[in-house]
């Protein structure tokens, strides 16, 4: 596994960002995944481009890693996929900038409503529902992340299970599962085998937790685990952001399949 750099406070830190430009959005053979930092990704599947939860500007906490591209530099997108409303996933500043070059925004109904309030072309979906973006078929998978109901400061409404999701993407070159922020759910252990997982391993009570990450990884023992939701926010005492790949490697079966990307670094999807 890649040597993990450390912040002065000892927090595991993402490798140095690898900036990219318009070339990452061009027609190509195959499917590539680029981590955008945080819980964001750019997926280019034979020229069809999607971003999941892009936070490219406007975040309100200090960062350990720069975004590999600014929102205003994105030449085009076929779709943006949003898993839930937290501002480290649904960046209003980023989405406003992407709106003019994006074919559409897809999210659970509640989040799509928030995006529509910004004037964005947003479509809401049921959990388990699907839609097509070019050759990519996307399906919303369940997530358990209604943490606001336990925080009077943040409970602006009764948050529902269906307000959050993951995304399962079937591409011509294999399947990608962006699990999303979620406590471990039994149904997440019974999915078809994905060819790659965008894997949150935050040891937080409203995330997968290390025990949950161990179980989820064991359910799909050969699937490459592209780590995200770690190493980018300067918050050494916040479990939501301070995951350590070296700790995860000591907990899971077949740790050699852990993929530690630098933000912006391309990774090629292959069928298992």
Annotate each predicted stretch with a short phrase:
Residues 36, 40, 132-193, 211:
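Catalytic core of the metallo-beta-lactamase
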Residues 26-31, 44-50, 130-139, 170-176, ...:
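Beta-strand-turn-beta hairpins that frame and shape the catalytic cleft
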Residues 43, 53, 84, 91, ...:
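Divalent metal-coordination and catalytic microenvironments
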Residues 68-131, 139-147:
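Active-site HxH/HxHxD metal-binding segment of metal-dependent hydrolases
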Residues 16-25, 40-85, 92-97, 147-158, ...:
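Pre-active-site segment of Zn-dependent metallo-hydrolases
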Residues 91-101, 117, 236-246, 270-271:
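Metal-dependent catalytic neighborhoods of phosphoester/phosphodiester hydrolases
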Residues 106, 110-113, 184-268:
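Cap/insert and terminal regions of metallo-dependent hydrolase folds
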Residues 32-35, 59-67, 89, 121-122, ...:
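Short gly/ser/thr-rich secondary-structure transition/capping motifs
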